[in-house]
């Protein structure tokens, strides 16, 4: 959710506490059919039954899963991030290598963009990057998604071919379009693997729609008031998966799942954007390419929605 780069850090600690509480393991009486849950698609084993978090009547609740559909590691979960397919064909925006002559990288504006500044240097630093990286650490909090800053009105496009399995409205009054890869069926309220296009407005798809890579899903969100004042919006992209044996949501680094035919061009694009931003801002400390492996990943750890990482 790239919390470290989208809100002043004075609010960050409180949000982290709320997130941690929201997804803490529920191995108690609260985990029962009909009780509230927090992440669609997560399945837990309680007693002799499996419970799955699904959306019913506009709310997320635990429901009992029939024995035909959820035993062990079948459609409800995967063993590890190694089971996530390499299917990503773009970064969620129509990006190109940075062109110093135009100051743009496809739909992203690089030259002439000035990030917000604050009296607190830590807040200023948190807003300093035009692309947020998976595994970035802000006040000890790991970021589980990537973030891209782009002009207001910029189209968000599907990263892959697949099915829209979830489309929740978020706390920020915008949306997340969550797409299961081609060949994976939706479960009620989600899927074991979901590629996230998070914080977009004016969604153009609905749950159940088949989408193609490059298809417009919506528009970059304007919810970040400090960037909005600069004429800029944002989108976060990530990959969620339900890990067998765990009842918390997990994320892996998106850049590990690029389609082989697109990997070279996509990594070149991201490298050129980072280098372009360094040049425009005249600040070599904004990105360390050597610290990213692959580009876009500052860690290979899986990260939970409580912003903690585990290998």
Regions found by a protein language model. Give the residues of each.
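Surface-exposed, glycine-biased beta-strand/turn segments
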Residues: 77-177, 184-186, 212-213, 222, ...
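Acidic, glycine-anchored pre-beta loop/turn
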Residues: 203-211
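Secretory targeting and sorting signals
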Residues: 1-29
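Disulfide-braced loops of extracellular cysteine-rich modules
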Residues: 36-40, 45-47
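Zn2+-dependent peptidoglycan hydrolase active-site motif and core
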Residues: 158-204, 226-238
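Extracellular disulfide-bonded cysteine-rich modules/repeats
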Residues: 47-55
């Amino acid at each position: 959710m790239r919390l470290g780069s989208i809100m002043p850090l004075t609010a960050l600690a409180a949000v982290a506490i709320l997130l941690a509480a929201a997804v803490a393991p529920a191995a108690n009486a609260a985990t029962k059919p009909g009780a509230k849950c927090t992440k669609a698609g997560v399945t837990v084993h309680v007693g002799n039954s499996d419970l799955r978090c699904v959306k019913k009547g506009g709310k997320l609740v635990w429901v009992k899963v029939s024995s035909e559909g959820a035993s062990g590691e079948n459609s409800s979960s995967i063993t590890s991030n190694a089971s996530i397919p390499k299917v990503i064909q773009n970064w969620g925006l129509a990006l190109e290598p940075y062109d110093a002559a135009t100051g743009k990288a496809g739909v992203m504006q690089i030259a002439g963009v000035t990030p917000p500044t604050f009296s607190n240097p830590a807040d200023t630093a948190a807003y300093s990057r035009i692309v947020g990286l998976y595994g970035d650490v802000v006040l000890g909090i790991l970021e589980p998604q990537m973030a891209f800053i782009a002009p207001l009105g910029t189209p968000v496009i599907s990263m892959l071919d697949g099915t829209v399995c979830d489309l929740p409205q978020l706390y920020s009054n915008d949306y997340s379009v969550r797409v299961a890869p081609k060949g994976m069926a939706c479960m009620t309220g989600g899927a074991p693997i979901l590629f996230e296009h998070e914080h977009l407005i004016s969604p153009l798809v609905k749950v159940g729609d088949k989408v193609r890579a490059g298809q417009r899903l919506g528009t970059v969100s304007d919810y970040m008031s400090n960037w909005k004042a600069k004429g800029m919006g944002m989108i976060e992209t990530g990959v969620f998966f339900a890990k067998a044996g765990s009842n918390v949501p997990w994320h892996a680094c998106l850049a590990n799942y690029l389609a082989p035919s697109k990997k070279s061009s996509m990594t070149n694009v991201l490298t050129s954007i980072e280098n372009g931003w360094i040049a425009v801002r005249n600040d070599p400390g904004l990105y360390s390419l050597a610290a990213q492996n692959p580009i876009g990943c500052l860690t290979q750890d899986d990260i939970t929605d409580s912003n903690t990482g585990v290998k």
